[in-house]
Amino acid sequence: MLKEERFQQILQYLQKDNKVVLSDLSRVLKVSEDTVRRDIKELSAQKLLKEVRGGALPHAPGPVDFKERENYAIRKKQVIAKKAVGLMKKGQVIILDSGTSALAVANAIPKDLNITVVTNSFPVVELLDERKDIEVFFAGGKLHRESLITTGHDTIGFFENIRADLFFLGVCSIDIELGVTGHYYDECAVKRAMIKSSREVFALSTPEKLNTAEAFSICQLVALSGIITSSPESSVMKTYKEAGINIV
């Protein structure tokens, strides 16, 4: 079997099963595990999958750039946002992450809740600019153009001095073993600081982001108070519920 044919089959199995295992691929493709490992490394270099110990996981579907993501899965994000604001209480300090799901949460905050929102997201600040009932703190730093946020040491230092009641974490990928992962190193570093500064952390995730992985680690699932999703009864959520993860 030619290498290109193996590549095609590996990607087909990945699409079908949402993961591939070296030993299984070795048996099916009738090649050594070392050969399969090299194939996966090459596919990972082409950004067609994420290499993990013993196999590979898919990347999360959908666009990466913020402006492209704004019109992606809008209805699902609205469902998530409604659940998120239901967890807010009057007078709380809330950290809102970057991402279009967090923007949907900001848009859904009810009137006269009188909360404080802390964020590094330019779109969130712009949206809340006219909300006189919400006190807004913005973390300065280096502009990250793809995500329309600030990053860097100044941003991290800012969040280290915050004590928030709730943090709504926008995610690229979630996996039961790898936890929450993201595309950009600098952005993930800021998210880790946000987690450390928050009493409760809720990940905002549509079902298709589960069982996927990206390059940079944010946190293990034990750091989460729960996962807020648009389809809590989806079959993909079963493994997470069985692991004791709170699914909202």
Can you name each region flagged by the protein language model?
Residues I74, Q78-A81, G99, L103, ...:
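Hydrophobic alpha-helical segments
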Residues L2-S23, R27-V28, E33-G99, A106-N114, ...:
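HTH-adjacent hinge/linker in prokaryotic transcriptional regulators
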Residues L2-E5, L11-Q12, K19-L25, V125-V248:
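Conserved phosphate- and dinucleotide-binding cores of soluble alpha/beta proteins
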